[in-house]
Amino acid sequence: MKAEILAIGTELLMGEIVNTNAQFLAEKLVDLGIYVYHQSVVGDNEERIMQAYELAFSRSDLLIVTGGLGPTKDDMTKEVAAKFFKRELVLHPESLEIMKTFFDARNLPLNEGNIKQAYFPIGAKILPNPNGTAPGCMVEEGGKTFILLPGPPREMIPMYENHVVPHLKPYQKNVLVSKVLHIVGIGEGHMVEKIEDIIDGQNNPTVAPYAKAKGLTLRITASGQNQSIAEGLIKPVQEAIQERLGEDVYGEGDITLEEVVAKKLIEKKQTIAIAESCTGGMLSGRLTNYPGISSVFMEAMITYSNEAKIKRLDVSPQTIENYGAVSEETAKEMAIGMARTANADIGLSVTGIAGPGGGTVDKPVGLVYIGLYLNGQMQAKKLIVSGDRQRVRKLTTTYALDFLRRQLMKV
């Protein structure tokens, strides 16, 4: 089955809101073994919506439309669908009664715009919406299926899960299973180079790399008659990849890097304190996202100025004068100073130049030092991080967590 997703709404075209519906639907359709061949967005314009319907009908078996089911005049998803299928719009009494109950309970008037939400192309299957006032519907003709869903995700997602999935299940020939591996500390090009033969040599399962701000992701997807068969196809490929990439693979599934680090700290009963400069609390924020971290997380400081580094962390003024605030030496002193101040086993520090200004030839924007005090030893790592200020700060937190993760593996 060839599937297509169409989002309707001028606000999407204008970039006022992000089309998270398409991402959700594409991912969930793949879980059913239904591949999305096309995605598109059109504004609230009858002619362009009609063109999108015509194109989808010509090339896809399934079209899922989101948006345009509201009470205003520019909500015309159903109206254009009725014209496309040459069907009359008819009132669905049950939907109208539900709508009346909804408005009566809130002491709100039911206007003509709301009433039009209870009209559907004749012969359509109605999809109830207990989370809003816009029911969806399903129209089938000529072996094709059009499914019209509301735009708000809190309405669309339950409607999809409760009504669309049961309809699509019979079309599922094979089970699709995906295993996601998370990789950090290695560039995408280098990673692909290490496993290129594995990627190129696979048909079932397939291996697809994705680059994200918090690291790289490898998705291994297999198709089988049942879940056990699909998982059996994935296992040897996953093992081969993990053997090649080693410690660069930090986890799988929904686990985050901060969760991995937090679990290692708790498992090894190592307390930690963090001193941040350029990241301004982002590093501590990521680590404290994990529930239970309070058993090992002692405290954190944002020592942005030189004075704060000297006063709060006991960094030597001479160190800053000789080497600068952004240096290996300062990062090390920040780490040990933080550990001693908090009486923690581990001190982790970050100092850098996030930009856009402040860089020099010797110390460019993106220069970062990560300091680590662990087991009585001081270490530091130098990085040059490219990108704008926000990207430099985000990636620095990732590199710092990864640096700590790798050292904890040796404890």
Swiss-Prot record:
Regions that span the bilayer: none
Alphabetical list of SUPFAM superfamilies matching this protein: CinA-like, Molybdenum cofactor biosynthesis proteins
Signal peptide range: none
Pfam families for the chain: CinA (PF02464), CinA_KH (PF18146), MoCF_biosynth (PF00994)
Family: Belongs to the CinA family.
NCBIfam families attached to this UniProt entry: cinA_nterm, molyb_syn, PncC_domain, PRK00549.1
Name the UniProt record assigns to this protein: Putative competence-damage inducible protein
Taxonomic source organism: Alkaliphilus metalliredigens (strain QYMF)
Name of the coding gene: cinA
